[in-house]
Design a protein with these regions (language model features):
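A short acidic, Gly/Pro-enriched loop at the edge of an enzyme's catalytic core
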Residues: 93-103
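A short glycine-rich, Lys/Arg-flanked "PGG" loop and its adjoining helix->strand segment in the class I
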Residues: 117-132
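Core SAM-dependent methyltransferase catalytic element
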Residues: 178-180, 195-213
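Short alpha-helix
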Residues: 162-185
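Conserved class I S-adenosyl-L-methionine
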Residues: 1-36, 49-53, 70-73, 132-160, 189
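Class I SAM-dependent methyltransferase SAM/SAH-binding core
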Residues: 41-91
């Protein structure tokens, strides 16, 4: 599925509005560990800060994004990293050859997807046998509760609009259909510096999956 003009505008607005640096959150860095020599694909890489952080952890990193202007900025700042113009819902053929050890899908990616199955199928095609997927994203429950812990929207509503609320079950099911085995799912309270929530509800989650041999 090609990104619409509405998608691209929404992604640009979110990228510019974020107050914190776009590197890797500490808990993601801990989850990734040493990436020395590993081929890593970063989906929806934006201006490249998090992709560069992956390279600093030792990865042979590739960044993917559908916004040429952001990719041009990334190329100027980090010319040794490969930057690819493409949609995370329909990966370009050169990325679908089963060569990556790890695919990283970071915060904000899931909410920009209209085609969850296309995203999952692309991840599976990019990974080598037994390759890994790491997803770090906003927990869908956090978007349903306001600052006073009152439910402000329906968790079970169908996803729609530029920001889509994919339920955890829908994400896991899409990965299963793509023959990706979910090995762990961890939920975290609190939130990032741009999203602060009551610590009694989940704000973000980490999901680990592996391509079957």
């Amino acid at each position: 599925m090609e990104p619409t003009d509405e998608n691209l505008r929404a992604w640009d607005v979110v990228h510019r509005a974020r107050p914190e640096p776009l590197g890797l959150p500490p808990l993601v860095q801990r989850a990734l560990g040493d990436l020395t020599g590993k081929r890593v694909l970063h989906l929806l890489c934006g201006g490249g800060e998090a992709t560069a952080a992956l390279a600093e952890l030792g990865a042979v990193a590739t960044g993917l994004d559908p916004r040429p202007a952001l990719l041009e900025t990334a190329r100027e700042r980090w010319p040794t990293i490969l930057w690819v113009d493409g949609d995370p819902q329909a990966l370009p053929p050169q990325l679908r050859r089963g060569r990556f050890d790890l695919v990283y899908s970071g915060e904000g990616v899931l909410g920009r997807l209209a085609d969850l199955d296309g995203w999952a199928a692309g991840v599976a095609a990019a990974l080598r046998a037994r390759g890994e997927l790491l997803v770090f994203d906003d927990h869908p429950v956090a978007d349903c509760v306001d600052g006073l812990l009152r439910w402000r929207s329906d968790y079970f509503r169908e996803p729609g609009g530029p920001d889509r609320l994919w339920r955890i079950g829908q994400v896991v099911s899409a990965l299963a259909r793509a023959r990706l085995h979910v090995e762990a799912l961890e939920e975290y309270p609190g939130g990032t510096s741009r999203r602060r929530h009551d610590r009694r509800i989940p704000a973000t989650f980490l999901l680990y999956a592996r391509r079957e041999a």
